[in-house]
Amino acid sequence: MKAVLTGDLIDSTHYELGLLSTILDTLKEELQYLEEVYGCRGWMERGDSLQVLTSEPGRAFQFALLLKAAVNKIGGDEGRKSGRPEADIRLFIGLGEVDMERASLAESAGEAFQLSGRGLDELKRKRINFGIQGPDAGFNAEMDVSCHLLDAVMKKWSIASAEVVYWRFRGLQRQQQIADRLGVLQSSVQRRMEVLGWSAVEAFADRYQLLVQNMQR
């Protein structure tokens, strides 16, 4: 079983060119990071869509939130980091087999690709920005409810929240490490984590990983 993450920028036609350019450069950097560190394959299309293929489906949620936080933290000087992000991305994770993997992800095929692509289209209809689906009906039922709840939490993130999430999923485990990276006090990072609902994010991540492991047995 593999995971395919498909995403597109939300309302990208309304972004100023400078902001859009920064977002695209950022996403390219993050895709390169995922390729170099985790062996993922990343691909961008039309300037506002992306796809990631990973043979570690248990990490797909981590990768999705890394990309989301990378976009959400863009923009905002020190005076407005408590404000809403200037940009956002819609993401869907599809879990399943990959029957044909070609040099171009656009030409690859399989259950994971189908679920991810169809799932992203369904998100637009439901007006939510995050979802997960796999080959198991019980897993899908739980993810549908959980992703709706998590989406509501993530829609309340500020730029400051996204900064913390980003560095947490970039591997900084301790609050002091994140504080040093951001140039703020550890107590500030702690407050940000409380406000963004980190305990809910962490609980979701743990549950997702457990369910994926069970499906792989």
Q: Which residues fall in each region the model found?
A:
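Regulatory and interdomain segments flanking nucleotide-handling catalytic cores
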Residues: 1-217
